[in-house]
Amino acid sequence: MPENISHDSETPAQEQQVITACAFIHHNFDGIEKVFLPKRADTKKFLPGVYELPGGHIDYGEDIIKGLKREIMEEFGMKATIGDPFATFTYLNKIKGSHSIEVIYFAKFDDSLENIVIHPEDHSRFEWIAENELGKAYTEYKRGDDPEMQAVKKGFSLLKGELLAFN
């Protein structure tokens, strides 16, 4: 990577489409389903200090599931089982100059939750957040109407077996 670029999310991709895979990693804590939401480091140029679903860019020619597993291992030192995709959305990344297509999958950690590692250049911390606590994850950059937060709400609805509306 060029010297002035510290992370792939800053690598220029002017007018290119980028595939991003993310995981709705959930766990049941004493009967309460929660989602794993790491908080991006404040030093990030794109969405600093924002809670997000774990994942990242899929490399050229890489299988999307293998790429998502790779991202989870790189960022948190954890193996994960990836389930079905349940949400997609697109956004423009003004830092990279790219058009991102995000695909969100259900997932579970395979390793003990005590083994989660946080790399400070990527994330400052993480939370396990229940559906009724999602307001804790909102920031000036990411509110309840944000597409990723809408996908998190959808994930909780699907876990509860609720039927979804169609557009």
Residue ranges and their predicted role:
Residues M1-D30:
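Acidic, metal-coordinating catalytic segment for phosphate/diphosphate chemistry
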Residues I32-E74:
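Conserved Nudix-box catalytic region and its N-terminal flanking loop in Nudix hydrolases
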Residues M78-A87:
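A short coil-to-beta-strand element that immediately follows conserved catalytic motifs
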Residues P120-N167:
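Nudix hydrolase/Nudix homology domain
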Residues A21-A23, P85, V103-A107:
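A structural signal for short, well-ordered beta-strand segments
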